[in-house]
UniProtKB/Swiss-Prot annotation:
It comes from Erythrobacter litoralis (strain HTCC2594). Its cofactor is heme. This is Tryptophan 2,3-dioxygenase. The keyword DNA-binding does not apply. It comes from the Bacteria.
Length: 263
């Protein structure tokens, strides 16, 4: 019954606060664990909102999606700020923890990968690392078979009468998005006359917000890694900073960036 619910029981705090298990004996390991666990909770919220927003866009019901996408952008700022907390860890602090991490890495976060896939940053090869956990690998493959958030936005443009090529609408969903001049032209028409296409204009700006904050998060990740471990390889086997620099060049919604030059 509701009157029996307490703050702790509703939030399941006993389990949440008992989920930190430092193994190194280092003081800073608690910080390391909590920052990553908190980030996973924010990612869970982002996914919750993005899945719902995608459904709204597919149904041409944009107004609720704007609130959802705005909420994701706010949650992303929390993810970005988490690097400020983690960066209080020095190279010496991290060196006491790293030997206990094995090959575990944030690169292996299934929720991060799901968010990339959902936004449109798709690479089927990234599922392989999750094969030891079949339910996660299955969920990621199922997402690759669905339209991404950006695919749904482009399909909406087509339904609204914009000239989107058939090859764009029928593209393989599990492949990386390839920039389209016709898609850029559609966005350019919207940006040149926002009053005529206000809801699509607002959708475009909400998507740009997501891209902007995601890139800020990636940049924060890069600079935090650079500050703490320099140019060592990552625990997950990546090249560390050089890998993160390469990721910064990847865009989810390329036409929404290039259209700024076009107009």
């Amino acid at each position: 019954m509701a009157q029996d619910v307490t703050y702790s029981s509703y939030l399941d705090l006993d389990r949440i606060l008992a989920a930190q298990h430092p193994v190194s004996g280092a003081h800073d390991e608690m910080l390391f664990i909590i920052v990553h666990q908190a980030s996973e909770l924010w990612l869970k919220l982002c996914l919750h909102e993005l899945f719902a927003a995608r459904d709204c866009i597919a149904a041409d019901n944009l107004r609720p999606s704007f609130k959802m996408l705005s909420r994701v952008a706010r949650a992303q700022t929390q993810l970005i700020q988490s690097w400020d907390v983690l960066s209080t860890m020095t190279p010496h602090d991290y060196s006491q923890i790293r030997p206990h991490l094995g090959r575990s890495s944030g690169f292996q976060s299934p929720q991060y990968r799901m968010m990339e896939f959902l936004l449109g940053g798709r690479n089927p090869d990234m599922v392989a690392m999750h094969e030891p956990t079949p339910e996660i690998a299955t969920a990621l493959r199922e997402e690759l078979a669905r339209t991404s958030l950006y695919d749904e936005a482009i399909r909406l443009l087509s339904r609204r009468g914009f000239a989107i090529p058939d090859e764009v609408l029928a593209r393989k969903l599990d492949e990386v998005w390839v920039r389209s001049e016709e898609v850029e032209a559609a966005w350019a028409e919207i940006y040149r006359d926002p009053q005529q296409h206000w809801d699509l204009y607002e959708l475009a700006e909400k998507l740009v917000d997501l891209e902007y904050h995601f890139q800020r998060w990636r940049f924060g990740h890069l600079k935090t890694v650079e500050r703490i471990i320099g140019f060592k390889r990552g625990t997950g086997g990546t090249k560390g900073v050089p890998y993160l620099e390469g990721v910064l060049k990847q865009a989810f919604f390329p036409e929404l960036l290039s259209v700024r030059t076009a107009i």
